[in-house]
Every structure is written in C-alpha cells, then in structure tokens.
Amino acid sequence: MKTVTMKVTGLVQGVGFRWTTQMIAQDLGITGTVKNNPDGSVSIVAQGEELPLEHFIKKIKASPSVAGHVDHVDLNTVSDAEKFTRFSVVY
C-alpha cells in the first residue's frame, strides 16, 4: 500500500474536479480525500496499490474534469500515513 499527496493547480475548482476525482478513485479502488484549497488549488491524498495508484495519478494529471484543466501536480509520497477506508470529498 502506497500513499501520495498531490496539490493540483489549474482550472480545478468549480468544474466538477473533486466529484470526478472521487469517481475515478472509486473505480480504481483508491482511498483517500480530495478538497478545495483557498488558493484555488485542489489537494488530494490517495492511497492504494502501486499499479492502480499510477493509473489514478495519470488520470489526475490529464484532468478528470472535461470542463477544467491541470497546469501542474506537485506529487509527494507519504510514509506512516493514516489508513483510509474510502475516498471522500472534504468540504
């Protein structure tokens, strides 16, 4: 099990980004959270097996929302992370 954090910038708020991110995560068996940040970016914590997590990251970089676009993803691996049981949108 691997955990990553992502800070995603671009047109990622107000375009269904969090909802589509949650749908992709659930389809791939990824757990974690997604939330909007005050600076207009989106933060994601994603946890899963290596291959599904790689697919998830690729989909995020390609922008899961057709109405938005991703300019940059700051990706970090986390050790000793909290264990998630589902993927949820944090408000």
Curated annotation (Swiss-Prot):
The active site is at residues 18, 36. Keywords: Hydrolase. Pfam families: Acylphosphatase. GO terms for molecular function: acylphosphatase activity. It comes from the Bacteria. The keyword Metal-binding does not apply. It catalyses: an acyl phosphate + H2O = a carboxylate + phosphate + H(+). Its EC number is 3.6.1.7. Residues 3-91 form the Acylphosphatase-like domain. Gene3D superfamilies: 3.30.70.100. Belongs to the acylphosphatase family. This is Acylphosphatase. The gene is acyP.
